[in-house]
């Protein structure tokens, strides 16, 4: 696992394992003021985890032109300890993201204003993994670039991407392919990735 508790600046520039370059399209690199307002409003109006994920998909599609359908989200108490805890992980070659319910609950109870930005960042990070970005540094860098581009540098989403330890000091990013040592019980989130479901039906 990669402990980010000492990180004090935006992730250093990293390369995608697929192309050797950032996955952000060159034509989207300039700050988009209208985009800031659009996606900020969408995130603000999101009512649940599924809504937040739909914003994640739109943001990634606008920034990279890439998307993936048919994903599921499972919630599980993955625990935590003195060394820290994992926010979420993506089991390799699956269609599910597993999110740790423990920090979700704590953030909702202690600082609910940060709940949506936290969820967005965690889902964005794992969604980028599902798109084939395996390297952790590359994933973090792409998440930061996308966040700044479409939310602005000062937005909580971008602040999470720049230095998550400011808000959740003991949260760690697991290495790609990480699995918890012990078994866990999954609670699947209903209606997740609803836009891809709708496209299959229509």
Predicted regions: what they are:
Residues 1-3, 121, 172-176:
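Intrinsic structural disorder
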Residues 1-9, 14:
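An acidic, glycine-rich, mixed-charge low-complexity segment common to nucleic-acid enzymes
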Residues 3, 16-19, 187:
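Compositionally biased amphipathic helical and low-complexity segments enriched in hydrophobic
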Residues 9-12, 30-108, 134-202:
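Metalloprotease/metallohydrolase-associated module, dominated by Zn2+-dependent proteases
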Residues 11-29:
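Long, positively charged low-complexity segments
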Residues 98-124:
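Short acidic, glycine/tyrosine-flanked loop/strand segments centered on an H-E-D-like triad
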Residues 117-136, 140-144:
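Active-site recognition of the HExxH zinc-binding catalytic motif
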